[in-house]
Each structure stands twice: as structure tokens, then as C-alpha cells.
């Protein structure tokens, strides 16, 4: 598959069983244990000894599962609702995507605490590398044959595996922290880069290589992010991205918050995405609860999500152009973002982190005058985008710094788990809002911007096109906003509609319990992915019939995008790396969670 090939994306079919039939035909139905879930995909448990065989088959089957979308683990030891599932102390899941089928499948493996070993999948999908490192970091599960199984998010000297159920979840459960001079020296020494550990040479045939730290506090790194560069002059021979400096333990926090009280934490994953972060989470919880929201809720959610897509892309545009040397545009983009925030603040009450979506609806209805504010923004913004394209994106210096730089094709993008504008810039027409509509996107008319060179310039141009399409979607929301309630009439809607609590004691009791303790979700698993600001973002939730999540897996696009860096930039110049980093569109909170 090349950047120029036309990849046909068939209509989405949830719970597509075709691959199950093919697997049963190849391996026998007795090989698999089928797990019923609300994830919208087949979930199959396989014996460990057949794992690589099954994964290889899925990678090579006609219309193959070319993308390892996600790979992570679960500590099963305290889970009570496991009827019909293989005995397991821990489990590892492999979430695979086939664009040619437009379907997913999840493969799970059960592990005993006495033998936490699996064969690596890095020979099948190169992007399994970081995911397996994170699983080892969080759970202590070893992947035999992995090229470099070391800490991913935690410091090199860290003791223990934080996502285990017996690992403390609150700071008060730890001993008081102290940092002696000796311990500080130990931590600093552990961070020292040793080229030999990564198979790098210090000397070539006729040259000595220099090793340069870009970050973790370099302005072009866009956050606390370190890339160690092996250089021959200014040419990048090899590099090692190092993440984890911004890790906050978001998935661990989800196990100690109620389904309702975790919503504000989602805002802080991609902290530029605002309510866009809430959407996959509440949609996944609503699948668990069996809640169908009113049409008005769908349209409100889409409108606000597209506002935050524009807000994100404006910041991206300004900082990207600034990274390659033009200082003025970032001030203009921030001025335009202020106009958008004026609308967001009027509707939600907050700006950067509204935490405004709710289980079963939104926090409150649209205020009086919202339509006038939205109309003013829609009248203003198109002219500004025209100016950006004319004044900045057609600039010869920008084009010279970015056209043909950090280029990759569709095949490479899929192998590394690249989604969003980074994938569509290669010519691959895959946007979840079209390919797998959610939250009512199937009712809107818009185009999917594409490019074909897959370089730093094309990624920016795709983002520009997306802003225009977001304006088009918001326009339709403005003109066709349905009447009706802003919350679903369902027992698990949280909080329940406030109006009834003043007259109905049972509703008042439910309101009190759901806000204080949290709603009790049925034991099951649910999954929702969305086309977020930076690519595909998803929440995979496991409920054990409690007021809190048993396991919350947050898959972010930026994690996959940064893992791809060495395969794209090796052999280029340092200046090209700066342009490449600016074109990716990432924030480290989205990477490290």
C-alpha cells in the first residue's frame, strides 16, 4: 500500500463476526473462548502457546489487520464477575484494526501470577515495542524477545508496578518522601544515556559520533520530552525518544474515582482538547449503562467538540509556524482562539477544562443568546483562515523547510499506529466521523481533508482543511439544533435532572447517592473511540458492578505518533526534526497520561 493507492473503506459493521468464522476455520473453535461485551468488536481469549500464531494469521489474512491499535494489561485478581472466562491473575489484550474491513478484533491472553511471560509481538507490528514496555512498567509482565524491555513511563529507579491492584493508589498510602543528596545523584546517574544499551556506537569508521539531548525542556519538544540524538555533524544517525516526565497515573486514578467524578480528569489528558476528551469516556460509560441520549444532546456535544477541534488546530498552526522561524502568526492565532473561548465560556462556564459532558447528557442546557455568539464566530473565522493560508502557508521559507521533510506513506503510518491528520496526509481517507459515525455525526455533511505526500507540510494543510470543515459542522448545529431535554431520562443519568428533585423524594435520594457515591454500572466491558484533535482517542472501560471502574484504559494518539519518530527522521538534519515535531501536533499530557 502506497501513499497514492486508493484504500476502500467499507461501511462499518459493529461486532463483525466474519473474522471469528475465519479464525475458527483456521484454528478450530475450541481454541478460543468468546467473551460477550459491549465493546462493539469480537473479543476472543486464546491460549498463550498459540498467541503468536493467531496474531500472525490476523496480520497476514486477506484484508489484514495491519494496525496494532492498542496493547495493554489488566490485573484480574480482584475481579469478581468473570463467569465463563479463562482463569487468570493477569491478562493482556491486543486490539487490532483492519481498515480494508473497517472492523476490529480483540485478542486476550490469560496469565498466572507465577509465570508472567509472553512472546513479543514486535516482529509482527513494530509499534508493539512501546506498548509492551508500558505493560512491563505497569504490571511486571515480561515479553520474551523484546529488543529493549525497560521502564516506559516511570523513572528507571522506580520500584514496583503501579497498575497492579496491590500497589498504593494514593500518596497518603506511601511513606513520606525525602530526597537525599546521595539519592539525587543516583537518580541523575540513572538518567544518563548509555549508547551501548541501545546498540549504538560511539565511533564510526572515520568519525566520532556526538550524542545530544534535545529536551526534556527544549521549546521545540512541546513539553517535558527528551530525544537523545546520535549525530554525525548535523545529520541524525539514530535517536531515542524518552517519555514519562508528564506521567500522572490517570488510569490508576480512574480506579479510585466514581464514574461521574472521573470526568474532570479526562479534560487533562489532551489538555487542549477540552470537552473532546469527555466524549469517548461518557459514550463508553453510556454503553455500559444502556443510555441513549436525546438528539439535542448529540448535537450540542458535536458542536462543542468541533469548537475545541478549531481551538486545538489554531494553537497547532501558530506554534508550528513559530517552530520554523515565523514569530508573528502565533499572536494572531491566539487572538482568534480568544474569540472561540468567548463562545465556549458562555456556554459551559469554563474555558480550557470545562468538564461539561455528563453521563447521559451535558451539565446544563444552552444559555440564552448562544446562537448569536456562535454566528459571530462563524462570520469571523473563515476570513482569518484565508489570511493564514495566504500570508503564512504559502510563504516560501515555510514551504522550503517542510515540503518533502519527515515523509512517510500509508503503509508505514498504519504499521506504527498513526491516526488523524498524520494518516490522512498520506492519502488514506479514514476519519472515524465518516468511517464509523458516533454521537450523530452521520447526520452532518462535511468532507474529509486529504493530502498525498505525507510530509510535514501536508500534515499542516490537512489541519487547515479540518478547521474549515469544523466550521461547516458548527454551522449545521446552529441551523438545526433540535428541541428537547439536555439529559436522558434514565436511572443512571448522572446527575439526574435537577428539576424533579424539588418535588420527588425518590429522585432526590438517587441524586444524592449518584453524586456522593456514584452510579453503579452493570458488570461488563465497553469501548468507544473518537476522531479527536490529534488522532483517534479511546476509552476501554471494565466494570465489575461497582461505583468505580475496575480498569480504565486510555489510548491516546500522541503516544503512537512519538514512537514513530526514529523511523521517520533518521538520516535527516536536526532542523528537519524541529519541523517534524511541530507537524505532529502533540502535547505530553496526551502521551504520558
Swiss-Prot record:
Subcellular location: Cell inner membrane
UniProt superkingdom: Bacteria
Keywords, ordered alphabetically: Cell inner membrane, Cell membrane, Membrane, Multifunctional enzyme, NAD, Quinone, Translocase, Transport, Ubiquinone
Species this chain originates from: Pseudomonas paraeruginosa (strain DSM 24068 / PA7)
Species lineage: Bacteria, Pseudomonadati, Pseudomonadota, Gammaproteobacteria, Pseudomonadales
Subunit structure: NDH-1 is composed of 13 different subunits. Subunits NuoB, CD, E, F, and G constitute the peripheral sector of the complex.
Main location: membrane
Region (NADH dehydrogenase I subunit C): 1-184
E.C. code: 7.1.1.-
Name of this chain's protein: NADH-quinone oxidoreductase subunit C/D
Top-level enzyme category: translocase
Annotated catalysed reactions: a quinone + NADH + 5 H(+)(in) = a quinol + NAD(+) + 4 H(+)(out)
Family note: In the N-terminal section; belongs to the complex I 30 kDa subunit family. In the C-terminal section; belongs to the complex I 49 kDa subunit family.
GO cellular component: NADH dehydrogenase complex; plasma membrane
InterPro entries membership: NADH_DH_suC, NADH_DH_suCD, NADH_Q_OxRdtase_suD, NADH_quin_OxRdtase_su_C/D-like, NADH_UbQ_OxRdtase_30kDa_su, NADH_UbQ_OxRdtase_49kDa_CS, NDH1_su_D/H, NiFe-Hase_large
A GO MF term: NADH dehydrogenase (ubiquinone) activity
HAMAP family, per the entry: NDH1_NuoC, NDH1_NuoCD_1, NDH1_NuoD
Role, per record: NDH-1 shuttles electrons from NADH, via FMN and iron-sulfur (Fe-S) centers, to quinones in the respiratory chain. The immediate electron acceptor for the enzyme in this species is believed to be ubiquinone. Couples the redox reaction to proton translocation (for every two electrons transferred, four hydrogen ions are translocated across the cytoplasmic membrane), and thus conserves the redox energy in a proton gradient.
Membrane topology, as annotated: Peripheral membrane protein
Region NADH dehydrogenase I subunit D, residue ranges: 208-593
Amino acid at each position: 500500500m502506497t501513499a497514492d493507492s486508493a484504500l476502500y473503506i467499507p461501511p462499518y459493521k459493529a461486532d463483525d463476526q466474519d473474522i471469528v468464522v475465519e479464525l475458527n476455520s483456521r484454528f478450530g473453535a475450541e481454541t478460543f473462548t468468546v467473551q460477550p461485551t459491549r465493546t462493539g468488536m469480537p473479543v476472543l481469549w486464546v491460549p498463550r502457546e498459540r498467541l503468536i500464531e493467531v496474531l500472525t494469521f490476523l496480520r497476514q489474512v486477506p484484508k489484514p489487520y495491519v494496525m496494532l491499535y492498542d496493547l495493554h494489561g489488566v490485573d484480574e485478581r480482584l475481579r469478581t464477575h468473570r463467569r465463563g472466562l479463562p482463569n487468570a491473575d493477569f491478562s493482556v489484550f491486543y486490539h487490532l484494526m483492519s481498515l480494508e474491513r473497517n472492523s476490529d478484533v480483540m485478542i486476550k491472553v490469560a496469565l498466572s501470577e507465577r509465570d508472567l511471560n509472553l512472546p513479543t509481538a514486535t516482529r509482527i507490528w513494530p509499534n508493539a515495542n512501546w506498548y509492551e514496555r508500558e505493560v512491563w512498567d505497569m504490571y511486571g509482565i515480561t515479553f520474551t524477545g523484546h529488543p529493549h524491555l525497560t521502564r516506559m513511563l516511570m523513572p528507571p529507579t522506580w520500584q514496583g508496578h503501579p497498575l497492579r491492584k496491590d500497589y498504593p493508589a494514593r500518596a497518603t498510602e506511601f511513606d513520606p518522601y525525602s530526597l537525599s543528596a546521595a539519592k539525587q545523584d543516583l537518580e541523575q546517574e540513572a538518567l544518563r544515556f548509555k549508547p551501548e544499551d541501545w546498540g549504538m556506537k560511539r565511533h564510526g569508521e572515520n568519525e566520532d559520533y556526538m550524542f545530544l539531548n534535545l529536551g526534556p525542556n527544549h521549546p521545540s519538544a512541546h513539553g517535558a520530552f527528551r530525544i537523545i540524538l546520535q549525530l554525525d555533524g548535523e545529520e541524525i544517525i539514530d535517536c531515542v525518544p524518552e517519555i514519562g516526565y508528564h506521567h500522572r497515573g490517570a488510569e490508576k486514578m480512574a480506579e479510585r474515582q466514581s464514574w461521574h467524578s472521573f470526568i474532570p480528569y479526562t479534560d487533562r489528558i489532551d489538555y487542549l482538547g477540552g470537552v473532546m476528551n469527555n466524549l469517548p469516556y461518557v459514550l463508553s460509560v453510556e454503553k455500559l449503562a444502556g443510555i441513549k441520549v436525546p438528539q439535542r444532546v448529540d448535537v450540542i456535544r458535536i458542536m462543542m467538540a468541533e469548537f475545541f477541534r478549531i481551538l486545538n488546530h489554531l494553537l497547532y498552526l501558530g506554534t508550528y509556524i513559530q517552530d520554523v522561524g515565523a514569530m508573528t502568526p502565533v499572536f494572531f492565532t491566539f487572538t482568534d482562539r480568544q474569540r472561540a473561548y468567548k463562545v465556549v465560556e458562555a456556554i459551559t462556564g469554563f474555558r480550557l477544562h470545562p468538564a461539561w459532558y455528563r453521563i447521559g447528557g451535558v451539565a446544563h442546557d444552552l444559555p440564552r443568546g448562544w446562537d448569536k455568539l456562535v454566528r459571530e464566530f462563524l462570520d469571523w473565522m473563515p476570513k482569518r483562515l484565508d489570511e493564514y493560508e495566504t500570508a503564512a502557508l504559502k510563504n516560501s521559507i515555510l514551504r522550503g523547510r517542510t515540503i518533502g521533510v519527515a515523509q512517510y506513506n500509508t503503509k508505514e503510518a498504519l504499521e506504527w499506529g498513526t491516526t488523524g491528520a498524520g494518516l490522512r496526509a498520506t492519502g488514506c481517507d479514514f476519519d472515524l466521523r465518516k468511517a464509523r459515525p458516533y454521537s450523530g455525526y452521520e447526520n452532518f455533511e462535511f468532507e474529509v481533508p486529504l493530502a498525498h505526500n505525507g510530509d510535514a507540510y501536508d500534515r499542516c494543510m490537512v489541519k487547515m482543511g479540518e478547521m474549515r470543515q469544523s466550521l461547516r459542522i458548527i454551522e449545521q448545529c446552529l441551523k438545526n439544533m433540535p428541541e428537547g431535554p439536555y439529559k436522558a431520562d434514565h436511572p443512571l443519568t448522572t446527575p439526574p435532572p435537577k428539576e424533579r428533585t424539588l418535588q420527588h423524594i425518590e429522585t432526590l435520594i438517587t441524586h444524592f447517592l449518584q453524586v456522593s457515591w456514584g452510579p453503579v454500572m452493570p458488570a461488563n466491558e465497553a469501548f468507544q473511540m473518537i476522531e479527536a484533535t490529534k488522532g483517534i482517542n479511546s476509552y476501554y472501560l471494565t466494570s465489575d458492578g461497582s461505583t468505580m471502574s475496575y480498569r480504565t484504559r486510555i489510548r491516546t494518539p500522541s503516544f503512537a505518533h512519538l514512537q514513530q519518530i526514529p523511523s521517520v527522521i533518521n538520516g535527516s538534519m536536526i532542523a528537519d526534526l524541529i519541523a517534524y515535531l511541530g507537524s505532529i501536533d502533540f502535547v505530553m499530557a496526551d502521551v504520558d497520561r
